[in-house]
């Protein structure tokens, strides 16, 4: 049986690649794509989701825009990483279809209610939409199988020394999600910083002769530029968001640990930090499966093999 999923994202180069990876597989039944502000402004992330689905010929998947700002803060965007459009690099088609008139939360709620099997939510941006869904529709919690999210880290930040971008943008939303009691898998920087795509990997992808692979190669050519800054110490570019889909497809590529995760919402230097209790020091019951390591070569193989399916 295919797993029903909803992708909640803020495209974003790595969000776009996560969508492409997910839709290459018959393991999933994609119910909806919803968007939030984050990597770019809400109008641009919504448009980018429509552009990617148009490229993939998947206008059958309903799309809805969500929260335009965090629950209690002003919006921060990552245009320094993703460019003016949010998907700088490739030439993408204009959307061939329109978003739904309803909001992201309304669309998610409708699809979860209608689903015969529990739904997996895959948020790869700030957690505002997911928090609003859980708060306004407690009756639907029982039909949510799990939340597999990209965000956080066990001890390193990429937006502040303590905080990863997605959680930092809306820590109050993240706090609500981690306290909701729904099974969570956290794909944080500990694992995503190992999921680097190198120049030779981009060449391998470009050698796959279909338009989707060419688009991904173009996305990566732009995305890697930001990560060449020596301060990061990267050889390539970390593909954060596709790790969520890779975990669902091939969990054997990862190492993971059950742990309690708390969200810091008030710290002077640590707002947005995910406090991961690896050693059980708090005595709190584990509320997440936290990913720590990845087989990078296996991850790149999965990505390349998935892109090859678009040639058929």
From Swiss-Prot:
<dbReference type="GO" id="GO:0006206">
    <property type="term" value="P:pyrimidine nucleobase metabolic process"/>
</dbReference>
<dbReference type="InterPro" id="IPR023186">
    <property type="entry name" value="IUNH"/>
</dbReference>
<dbReference type="InterPro" id="IPR036452">
    <property type="entry name" value="Ribo_hydro-like"/>
</dbReference>
<keyword id="KW-0378">Hydrolase</keyword>
<comment type="function">
    <text>Hydrolyzes cytidine or uridine to ribose and cytosine or uracil, respectively.</text>
</comment>
<dbReference type="GO" id="GO:0045437">
    <property type="term" value="F:uridine nucleosidase activity"/>
</dbReference>
<dbReference type="GO" id="GO:0006152">
    <property type="term" value="P:purine nucleoside catabolic process"/>
</dbReference>
<feature type="active site">
    <location>
        <position position="240"/>
    </location>
</feature>
<dbReference type="GO" id="GO:0008477">
    <property type="term" value="F:purine nucleosidase activity"/>
</dbReference>
<comment type="similarity">
    <text>Belongs to the IUNH family. RihA subfamily.</text>
</comment>
<dbReference type="GO" id="GO:0005829">
    <property type="term" value="C:cytosol"/>
</dbReference>
<protein>
    <recommendedName>
        <fullName>Pyrimidine-specific ribonucleoside hydrolase RihA</fullName>
        <ecNumber>3.2.-.-</ecNumber>
    </recommendedName>
</protein>
<dbReference type="InterPro" id="IPR022975">
    <property type="entry name" value="Pyrim_hydro_RihA"/>
</dbReference>
<keyword id="KW-0326">Glycosidase</keyword>
<dbReference type="Pfam" id="PF01156">
    <property type="entry name" value="IU_nuc_hydro"/>
</dbReference>
<dbReference type="InterPro" id="IPR015910">
    <property type="entry name" value="I/U_nuclsd_hydro_CS"/>
</dbReference>
<dbReference type="GO" id="GO:0015949">
    <property type="term" value="P:nucleobase-containing small molecule interconversion"/>
</dbReference>
<dbReference type="InterPro" id="IPR001910">
    <property type="entry name" value="Inosine/uridine_hydrolase_dom"/>
</dbReference>
